[in-house]
């Protein structure tokens, strides 16, 4: 597992593109593993702070219970954002896989809450999203181009 900063050190362009997507909407889709082993997908507000990825989860929500029981997650950014007009949409996507780690440090919680783009309640639990694999997809001249990262590897490939 790696922090977002460690991914940035290995694949800075992937992280820059990913942060543009995450900051364009501040929302992404978080997939967790239900108790029966099935997938569950939720929209969440993502916060990038100090080169780390965080999410606050409300008390009592299924996604919070899922991550406390099984920390594996997948995160998918919204797939496109406008560059002024409909004709200039950017067809980019960010997908992350990893483990969510609960953060109980009060200083970290306060620092993330200060820059979080939504209301944070006392019972909300902060998780850091550690990364096992990352992928950014864009299009160049109509061709999908993927940049992938995993610990010890990186590659740029057209598909």
Placement of each model-derived feature along the sequence:
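Proline-centered flexible-loop/turn and helix-kink motifs
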Residues: 12, 69-71
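Short beta-strand segments in beta-sandwich/barrel cores
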Residues: 28, 53, 73, 100, ...
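Structural motif corresponding to alpha-helix initiation and N-cap regions
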Residues: 15, 60-61
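Short, conserved active-site entrance elements at the starts or edges of catalytic domains
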Residues: 4-34, 159
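A generic "binding-loop/recognition-motif" signal
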Residues: 59-60, 132
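Short beta-strand segments
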Residues: 25-59, 65-67, 75-79, 86
